UniProtKB/Swiss-Prot annotation:
Domain of life: Bacteria
One annotated GO biological process: leucyl-tRNA aminoacylation
Keyword Nucleotide-binding applies: yes
Lineage per the UniProt record: Bacteria, Bacillati, Bacillota, Bacilli, Lactobacillales
UniProt EC number: 6.1.1.4
'HIGH' region (motif): residue ranges: 41-52
Family: Belongs to the class-I aminoacyl-tRNA synthetase family.
Catalytic activity: tRNA(Leu) + L-leucine + ATP = L-leucyl-tRNA(Leu) + AMP + diphosphate
Keyword Mitochondrion: no
Protein name (record): Leucine--tRNA ligase
GO molecular function: aminoacyl-tRNA deacylase activity; ATP binding; leucine-tRNA ligase activity
Length: 833
């Protein structure tokens, strides 16, 4: 057979690995450890697409490489299986979300196994398994005991069609829900919150210790959003009311000409004049229909209403009209801002819109034309005049503190984590509300609080989840006869994914989240690979929970993930018409190398775009495995380009990778394998071992494969192949194409055992040194020949070889040699006349 028969070989070795538990996690305490983690998937009905295996292949290469280097390797996989999609599907079809999820998991697992990933399936976790979410609930009870889980009446992003509130991060820029694209409105509701803000400073500072890309760290820093400034208290004219504003620029107080409250601010109704009451009420209603993202969009038209009230500027006593505007959020800062229109563009636009005064307090711009937002010396600012920013801030803060109307303050953009969902398909929150007004956590001995099975999973629409309808589950009675009601909200999908990497370490422990010694052995995760779309939410939440567990003494490290790598996106093929509109692939035909719209005949431009069902350009890995084989898919996705780049899928590239594997197969199976080394491939082999080893370490898998190709080309020029080099090469390709490598290993090693734990090859540095070098021969300064000679020859030896060369002899025939200049390892110059 002269080609790689993937249909026969790949299932054979997948069966072998499963039967022999080849990838069971090592427990030899004398070995170093390596924990390679993938972001576990949500098991959707659509199954895997070709984007999933990119990251999975990367961690699999590292895991196979580290096993060969003698490491204990933990390489697990599991399922992030709670969440809205399964519940939405269940409501649409009448199916049980648990059954739907189980079917999807079985399909995902089949697809993953068909790709030859070396997961230890004994450590599989599923966030919907009560034995798993027992510990999710346990973590929640600990947060509750420490005051970090609390209830609050907060304005939430309510989605009527989903029957639930969603987090700010799940609202799209257009004001619709990420899931389903439904309208989002603001609605006050009783919600569970987690006090992530208590960890803001640690979450910020500890980023410096992590081997993550600066772009991801910056995204987290910006999300946490630390600001240093001052709280300033403004009294409301003619009343005993006052409100506080946080500002990073208290030095511009002399330029504050009006104040703006969030429409939801608690003072609004109390200070609104009777003349303005109707307009204020109308505006508050309109604001409630908008999401935070829409309200804070800098590009949107500025709207607002005057309350009829005035605030008193604490530094100059001037009256400042108090407005309400939807760009101020009650949930951010104090829900109030002091407007300095001369030096803030949004305030400037608002002032121009409503004809409010603009007072310059920093010199350097023309504030009639636009806000001046750079720094400058202070003007029109009484005792601050002539001062720079730093000096002015220090002086004004001292003044405010002396007057008792302000103080220095550090704030964070980060908000507490909205942790409850009004849905069925999630972890029940283990809290009981008693009729005497108290609430208690479900005792640890009664965990897990199991999600009851029901077919009635439609949201109540009242803000409670479907669990409110299940009386037998809902109502409880204490030993003293006091009646209670279970919490009906469930946890968000983020809950189970915030700690799953810990459970992999000890997945069958019934007594605790995980054994302390095992946690010490395996933490932190050595490399975590996944999409950059999780840069803020999942990673921030996981870091928060990890730090909390560190404070409890459960985990031994301050951070969960030492190294993070975000793979790029695999783009699909798409087509655009002359307007730039995307055209689905089933509407396109190819003629003479160009692409045309089947219906209109218009010639289309081919362009990469994100794979989507609507464009019909999603590539199913099942189809690729069937036609080309899993090893081809693995090699192709790693060879496409740098791992972190977004690159378009190419059928031609796939075929090229398949041809390469066929060449590898033929090289090993058709060459004569020598027991003795003839030295012909010394340099090529040792260069390949060195390069592939270093490139795997640095995740440059595309260049590692390119080097493997270089060796195949060199080896194909030889009639025979030294057996140790054949073995070493098979070991080098094994992390990339494990099925092919296992099969070829049997032909040269004849052990009958897997290649997985054979020691990784090493290189001989002395073999990397060139034995021969190329020198040039010049005659009267012009190059007439290039010769391969032994390295470090003397001048005399070089001269002798050059003069004996046939080409050189022909050039100097009949001429007198005046002089010969020899430069060892470089050139011979012959002067003739």
């Amino acid at each position: 057979m002269s080609f790689y028969n993937h249909k026969e070989i790949e299932p054979k070795w997948q069966g072998y690995w499963a039967e022999h538990h080849t990838f069971k996690t090592g427990t030899d305490a004398s070995k170093p450890k390596f924990y390679a983690l993938d972001m576990f998937p949500y098991p959707s009905g659509a199954g895997l697409h070709v984007g999933h295996p990119e990251g999975y292949t990367a961690t699999d290469i590292l895991s196979r490489y580290k096993r060969a280097q003698g490491y204990n390797v933990l390489h697990p996989m599991g399922w992030d299986a709670f969440g809205l999609p399964a519940e939405q599907y269940a409501m649409d079809t009448g199916n049980d979300p648990a059954e739907f999820t189980a079917e999807n998991i079985a399909n995902f697992k089949r697809q993953i196994n068909a790709l030859g990933f070396s997961y230890d399936w004994d450590r599989e976790v599923n966030t919907t398994d009560p034995n798993y979410y027992k510990w999710t609930q346990w973590i929640f009870t600990k947060l509750y005991e420490k005051g970090l889980a609390y209830e609050a009446e907060v304005p939430v992003n309510w989605v009527e069609e989903l029957g639930t509130a969603i987090a700010n991060e799940e609202v799209l820029p257009d004001g619709t829900s990420e899931r389903g694209g439904y309208p989002v409105v603001r609605k006050p509701m009783r919600q569970w919150m987690l006090k992530i803000t208590a960890y803001a400073e640690r979450l910020l500072n500890d980023l410096d210790e992590l081997d993550w890309s600066e772009s991801i760290k910056d995204m987290q820093r910006n999300w946490i959003g630390k600001s240093t400034g001052a709280n300033v208290t403004f009294k409301v004219k003619g009343t005993d009311k006052e409100f506080t504003v946080f500002t990073t620029r208290p030095d511009t107080l002399f330029g504050a000409t009006f104040t703006v409250l969030a429409p939801e601010h608690e003072l609004v109704d109390a200070i609104t004049s009777s003349e303005q009451a109707e307009a204020v009420a109308d505006y508050k209603h309109q604001a409630s229909l908008k999401s935070d993202l829409v309200r804070t969009d800098l590009a949107k038209e500025k709207t607002g209403v005057w309350t009829g009230a005035y605030a008193i500027n604490p530094v100059n006593g001037k009256e400042m009209p108090i407005w309400i505007a939807d760009y101020v959020l009650a949930s951010y800062g104090t829900g109030a801002v002091m407007a300095v229109p001369a030096h803030d563009q949004r305030d400037w636009e608002f002032a121009k819109q409503f004809d409010l005064p603009i007072v310059e307090v920093l010199e350097g711009g023309n504030v009639e034309e636009a806000a001046y937002t750079e720094d400058g010396l202070h003007v029109n600012s009484d005792f601050l005049d002539g001062l720079n920013k730093e000096d002015a801030i220090a002086k004004i803060v001292a003044c405010l503190e002396e007057k008792g109307c302000g103080q220095e303050k550090v704030t964070y953009r980060l908000r507490d984590w909205l942790f409850s969902r009004q849905r069925y398909w999630g972890e029940p929150i283990p809290i009981i509300h008693w009729e005497d007004g108290t609430s208690t956590a479900v005792p640890e001995t009664e965990l897990p609080l199991v999600l009851p099975v029901t077919k009635d999973i439609r949201p109540s629409g009242t803000g409670e989840s479907p669990l409110a309808n299940l009386t037998d589950w809902l109502e409880v009675t204490r030993e003293d006869g006091v009646k209670g009601r279970r919490e009906t909200n469930t946890m968000p999908q983020w809950a189970g994914s915030s700690w799953y990497y810990l459970r992999y370490i000890d997945p069958h422990n019934t007594e605790k989240l995980a054994d302390e010694d095992l946690l010490k052995q395996w933490l932190p995760v050595d490399i975590y690979v996944g999409g950059a779309e999780h840069a803020v939410l999942h990673l921030l939440y996981a870091r928060f929970w990890h730090k909390f567990l560190y404070d409890l003494g459960v985990v031994p490290t301050k951070e969960p993930f030492q190294k993070l790598f975000n793979q790029g996106m695999i783009l699909g093929t798409s087509y655009r018409d002359h307007r730039g509109a995307l055209v689905a692939t089933d509407k396109v035909e190819k003629r003479d190398g160009s692409f045309f719209h089947i219906e209109t005949g218009e010639e289309l431009e081919q362009a990469p775009a994100k794979m989507s069902k609507s464009l019909k350009n999603v590539v199913n890995p099942d189809d690729v495995v069937e036609q080309y084989g899993a090893d081809t898919l693995r090699v192709y996705e790693m060879f496409m380009g740098p791992l972190d780049a977004s690159i378009a899928w190419s059928e031609e590239g796939l075929e090229g990778s398949r041809k390469f594997l066929d060449r590898v197969y033929r090289l090993i199976t058709s060459k004569e394998i020598l027991a003795e080394n003839n030295g012909a491939l010394d340099k090529a082999y040792n260069e390949t071992v060195k390069a592939v080893t270093e490139q795997i370490e640095s995740l440059k898998f595309n260049t590692a494969i390119a080097q493997l190709m270089v060796f195949v080309n060199a080896a194909n020029k030889e009639d025979k192949l030294y057996v140790d080099y054949a073995k070493g090469f098979i070991q080098l390709i094994a992390p990339f194409a494990p099925h092919l490598a296992e099969e070829l290993w049997q032909t040269v090693a004849e052990t009958g055992e897997s290649i997985s734990y054979v020691a990784w090859p090493t290189w001989d540095e002395s073999k990397l040194v060139e034995d021969e070098i190329e020198i040039v021969v010049q005659i009267k300064g012009k190059v007439r020949a290039k010769l391969m000679v032994a390295k470090d020859l003397s001048r005399e030896e070089l001269q002798e070889i050059a003069l004996a060369d046939e080409k050189v002899k022909a050039e100097i025939d009949g001429k007198e040699i005046v002089k010969v200049i020899s430069v060892p390892n470089k050139l011979v110059n012959i002067v003739v006349k």
